[in-house]
Amino acid sequence: MSMSDIQQRPQIPTTTTAAVAAAASTNVNTGAATTSTATTGNTPTTTPTSPIENISKVPVKPSVDVPVKPKLEQQQQQQSEQSSKPPPPPPEQQQQHQLPTPPIKPPKTGTTSSSSSTTTSSATSSKISMSGPVCGNCQTQTTPLWRRDETGQVLCNACGLFLKLHGRPRPISLKTDTIKSRNRVKQNGSNSQSSKSSGANTPELKSKEGKSGKKSPKSKKKSLGNGNGNGNSSHDHNTLTPLLPATSNNTPTFKSTTSQSQHQQNQNHHHQHHNHHHHLPNHVLQTHQVPLHYPSSTPTQFAPGLQRITSPLLLSTTSSSSSIRTEPNNNNTSKLTPIQAAAGALENMSNELGPSATFKKGNNINGISLMNKTKKDVSSINGSSTSLSSSSASSSIFSSVAPSTSSSSSLSNGTTINNPAPKLPTLGSKISSPSSQPFTRSTTPLQTLPPLHKIASHESSLPPLHNISTYNNNNSGGGADGGQQSMANYSQTNRSPINGNQDNNNNNNNNNNNNNNGNNNGNNNSNNNGNNFTASAHEVTLLKTRISELELVNDLYRTRIMELEAMEQAARLRENSMKKRLDEVMNLQINYQNLLNNNGGMSSQTQPQPSQQPQQAGQYYSNNNNNNNNDQGSQSISPNVSITGSTTITSPNSRSKIISETTPTHHQQQQGGVGAGDNESIILPPLKRNRTDELTDANGNGNGNDNKKVKI
């Protein structure tokens, strides 16, 4: 039963909502299409706000699981009133009005859960005067949905959403002369189906949107109504709804993303099943589907305007135009199979894109605004992936809406998004990574993940760390040059992954061009843009990492330099102390010589030794001097002569050489001036005193870096 048939049937208004709830229209699934026969009891309740009393109304068609709610019926009547306000538009136009508005969320039902499409319109739509309202902000008269602000002033959909989300009036600069509603391919055969689907999908959208929970009838305002182009499919709602508030400011440029492709896919048959089809923006569908989708409410002339407005999303109206299937034209002929296919597609989507579906929210945030064309419209990617999952059900071509500038964006169902997948991995991966090869992934949100993982894994921050360890080794070796070399190596290692990423991106672009052939470049371009953004972000992180590592290396150098300076200062102090000790020892020896000189004949033999030591006061004593014997007693005298005991020599390296020297008593010093001819060596009493004198030389190993503790 088509929408026109249902709408043409006059219905008896009754004021009892109980009767409405009691008499739920039965859902009859025929082979050709799911037609709903409404019982006479299922009549609209009279709504005080409706200016029109006798309105042909689409009866609520509850699925077996979902009971009919009087509130829904009121909304249905209100929306039907709205649709009937202009000179009675064809039923297609009524659905046009109904579809762009976000649905209310009743509990989710199976593929063909049905509630009238009128539920999608908010209660405010019924308040519009019949004379044709004018937006109080932008003065426009063309809008898919009229809204009111807190003061009751009539606003267009865009201004109302902008005010609601941003708390301030929508700037006039954002005003566009084209309507922002989404295209719908609605033919008489599919009108009833679409009406069912809008109601059926409302539960999914609304149940998944936490933000629109407080406004059951008006959830569309904030959630899906905000861009009219926020054609978030039921699967998209989980992740994409967070985008909605952010995208609302960009409502003029439809953020419709993923749902576009799905809409194209399922537009003919899936309208009943998937709410996202109704909310799909017309960007991709615009050229071919505009006449189909906008029989009356939005003239096809606005489609080019929509293209211009949403050009970032429009990636390929040209290729998509050829690729956009003739299925919309074949809706009447292919009712049975499309419906069944829609059921299967919905099933697949619900499985893959259910509440458990995990999308990267960070990416979604990036994809929020189409105003910034550079941002990655992740939602479009998600939509394309989800539509791919349901591609088995229908042969329609997906046009993924991505902000990329390429003109071709439609992907055939059968093609898994191989092209976008290779690009994403390449961001993090080096040239050797298989990212250039196409990956088949059922959902693109997973595709968005790989770059992050590879950024963590492939982009090796480790090589710089290893280089830092080499810096430490070089520093410990004391070689500043080694540190600089390691710095150079480090910078090279850091540069190489970035260059590798750039090469990979280029290679991926080439591969994508080769792989696309008949496929959408739109997905590839969107992925490329995402890759570029992630690559730039990744480069920034690499630069920050390099800076931190360089700072660490500088700190290591500084600490090493400080250590070396401290060591040098300590060595100087030791040298000074050794010199002082040497001077003290020399003074002691001089004093000792004086004592010997003062002694009588008994000291005549020993006097030459001290007498000669003043001459040697400036000399450093080495252990080899023990073997030096004088032919002339008045000249070279070994410092150890006539010293009994052991000389302990301590080097600054804390080595101690204990040289036990037995000074022979026959070592006699003959003096020419002294007449004592004996060969006897006389040990003087001072020699028997125990003294520890340190004879130290500051000149190192052989020259007397050794501290000599002499027991005299």
Curated annotation (Swiss-Prot):
InterPro entries referenced in this protein's UniProt entry, alphabetically: Asd-4/GZF3_helical (IPR056998), Transcription_factor_GATA (IPR039355), Znf_GATA (IPR000679), Znf_NHR/GATA (IPR013088)
Zinc finger map (GATA-type): 135-159
Protein name as annotated: Transcriptional regulator GZF3
One record GO biological process: filamentous growth
Keyword terms, alphabetized: Coiled coil, Metal-binding, Nucleus, Stress response, Zinc, Zinc-finger
Broad class of where this protein is predominantly found: nucleus
Gene3D superfamilies associated with the record: Erythroid Transcription Factor GATA-1, subunit A (3.30.50.10)
